[in-house]
Amino acid sequence: LEYERILEEALRDIGAEFDTETDLRAEGASRTPDVRLKVPISVCGRTIHWIDSKASFCDPQVHEESGSKQFRAYVNRFGSGMVIYWHGVVEELREVDPNVLLVDAFPERKDIVMLARFEEDGENEDF
């Protein structure tokens, strides 16, 4: 939970709106990432709809046994996303899945682009 709070605080700091895992479960979702972004962000050129936070190190065995299937379910339901393994990621895994960005820290502000939200009246609001 500590790392989830760090993630949520980082998202608030950049002005991102999001639903938490608790919010998603209240909507009836069973398998959920830690946050679903209400408006996607771009991180290093990749569109991110959801973020999961792991208080662990990711090596090929950990990724295959516990992450790979779980993240595919999130991609199928919510679109592409990002997983933060706070204790590191083996470099070879960072580009394994084009729909799941694996990182070891919340991205720096310079690597994040806030995407526009389109309002019902046709106007858009940049964040």
Locations of the language-model features?
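Acidic-basic catalytic patches of nuclease active cores, encompassing PD-(D/E)XK
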Residues: L1-A26
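Conserved catalytic cores of phosphodiester-cleaving nucleases, focusing on short active-site segments
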Residues: L11, P33-P60
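Short, flexible loop/turn elements at secondary-structure junctions
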Residues: G15, T22, V39, A55-F57, ...
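A structural preference for short, hydrophobic beta-strand core positions in alpha/beta folds
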Residues: T20-E21, V83, L102
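Catalytic phosphate/metal-binding cores of nucleic-acid and nucleotide-processing enzymes, i.e., regions
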Residues: L24-E27, S42-C44
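Short secondary-structure capping/turn micro-motifs that flank functional sites
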Residues: A26-G28, V90-E91
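Catalytic cores of nucleic-acid endonucleases
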Residues: I48-H49, S53-P98
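Domain-level recognition of nuclease-like catalytic cores that cleave nucleotide substrates
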Residues: G88-F127
